[in-house]
């Protein structure tokens, strides 16, 4: 098979591992810089050009799109879809999962366990917003933040009011969530591929830190997840429409709660912690499921 990996840096661990795994399985792997792709939209002949050449003959595309280029990146994935190339994750699913608020709204509607979450626009509603999530301590998150950036733990009500008001004053959209103290600064990253959890790790926050992101000094270790946690991760990925997802779960007194569903989960932490060939399993999923893509848009035949 001829497989494209959309990545801005071919030296990144995840990109290198996918190339290695694909080539080991006998596939032709191409790392393509997302931002160097440009598109031609002509009746019945959508094209992607890359560094002066037309991209042709690809069977599948693996999107590794950073949050800062979501709009352009999903447009490129969508163009591959229009060309009939199988996307590991569809463009609409990537867009859906990147919108934190939309993700939680969809998961909430389907009954997936979540931390109590509030969202408001007016500073006048801050007091009730805090009450909504059972008061302080609480977590304040920028909707555009990634890797733990833009996440604040407010220990007191007064601190929460000040931080939320400051964000609102800067026209920064934030959501407020209950603080799951019993999680002890740890979360579980479940790596879902093709409707199955193929690997899971526990991420523990560094001392004095409540964010467990590995980019913020957290540590990772192998963990045995419960059947309920496994089912929750699979369901969350399915609701987002993602074939490949990193589902972040906290253990709370009222069962597993989903914090985030990541459409471009990194491989280094999970492979190191679990000693599993996650990249190889992702390639096997492509071998099994890749087929000419047909758009799902109503009224469209192709």
From Swiss-Prot:
<feature type="binding site">
    <location>
        <position position="260"/>
    </location>
    <ligand>
        <name>Mg(2+) 1</name>
    </ligand>
</feature>
<dbReference type="InterPro" id="IPR013651">
    <property type="entry name" value="ATP-grasp_RimK-type"/>
</dbReference>
<dbReference type="InterPro" id="IPR011761">
    <property type="entry name" value="ATP-grasp"/>
</dbReference>
<feature type="binding site">
    <location>
        <position position="248"/>
    </location>
    <ligand>
        <name>Mg(2+) 1</name>
    </ligand>
</feature>
<dbReference type="InterPro" id="IPR004666">
    <property type="entry name" value="Rp_bS6_RimK/Lys_biosynth_LsyX"/>
</dbReference>
<keyword id="KW-0460">Magnesium</keyword>
<keyword id="KW-0547">Nucleotide-binding</keyword>
<protein>
    <recommendedName>
        <fullName>Probable alpha-L-glutamate ligase</fullName>
        <ecNumber>6.3.2.-</ecNumber>
    </recommendedName>
</protein>
<feature type="binding site">
    <location>
        <position position="262"/>
    </location>
    <ligand>
        <name>Mn(2+) 2</name>
    </ligand>
</feature>
<feature type="binding site">
    <location>
        <position position="187"/>
    </location>
    <ligand>
        <name>ATP</name>
    </ligand>
</feature>
<dbReference type="Pfam" id="PF08443">
    <property type="entry name" value="RimK"/>
</dbReference>
<dbReference type="GO" id="GO:0006412">
    <property type="term" value="P:translation"/>
</dbReference>
<feature type="binding site">
    <location>
        <position position="260"/>
    </location>
    <ligand>
        <name>Mn(2+) 2</name>
    </ligand>
</feature>
<feature type="binding site">
    <location>
        <begin position="178"/>
        <end position="179"/>
    </location>
    <ligand>
        <name>ATP</name>
    </ligand>
</feature>
<feature type="binding site">
    <location>
        <position position="260"/>
    </location>
    <ligand>
        <name>Mg(2+) 2</name>
    </ligand>
</feature>
<keyword id="KW-0479">Metal-binding</keyword>
<feature type="domain" description="ATP-grasp">
    <location>
        <begin position="104"/>
        <end position="287"/>
    </location>
</feature>
<dbReference type="InterPro" id="IPR023533">
    <property type="entry name" value="RimK"/>
</dbReference>
<keyword id="KW-0648">Protein biosynthesis</keyword>
<dbReference type="Pfam" id="PF18030">
    <property type="entry name" value="Rimk_N"/>
</dbReference>
<feature type="binding site">
    <location>
        <position position="262"/>
    </location>
    <ligand>
        <name>Mg(2+) 2</name>
    </ligand>
</feature>
<keyword id="KW-0464">Manganese</keyword>
<dbReference type="GO" id="GO:0005524">
    <property type="term" value="F:ATP binding"/>
</dbReference>
<dbReference type="InterPro" id="IPR013815">
    <property type="entry name" value="ATP_grasp_subdomain_1"/>
</dbReference>
<feature type="binding site">
    <location>
        <position position="248"/>
    </location>
    <ligand>
        <name>Mn(2+) 1</name>
    </ligand>
</feature>
<dbReference type="InterPro" id="IPR041107">
    <property type="entry name" value="Rimk_N"/>
</dbReference>
<feature type="binding site">
    <location>
        <position position="141"/>
    </location>
    <ligand>
        <name>ATP</name>
    </ligand>
</feature>
<dbReference type="GO" id="GO:0046872">
    <property type="term" value="F:metal ion binding"/>
</dbReference>
<comment type="similarity">
    <text>Belongs to the RimK family.</text>
</comment>
<dbReference type="GO" id="GO:0009432">
    <property type="term" value="P:SOS response"/>
</dbReference>
<dbReference type="GO" id="GO:0036211">
    <property type="term" value="P:protein modification process"/>
</dbReference>
<feature type="binding site">
    <location>
        <position position="260"/>
    </location>
    <ligand>
        <name>Mn(2+) 1</name>
    </ligand>
</feature>
<dbReference type="GO" id="GO:0018169">
    <property type="term" value="F:ribosomal S6-glutamic acid ligase activity"/>
</dbReference>
<dbReference type="GO" id="GO:0005737">
    <property type="term" value="C:cytoplasm"/>
</dbReference>
<keyword id="KW-0436">Ligase</keyword>
<feature type="binding site">
    <location>
        <begin position="211"/>
        <end position="213"/>
    </location>
    <ligand>
        <name>ATP</name>
    </ligand>
</feature>
<keyword id="KW-0067">ATP-binding</keyword>
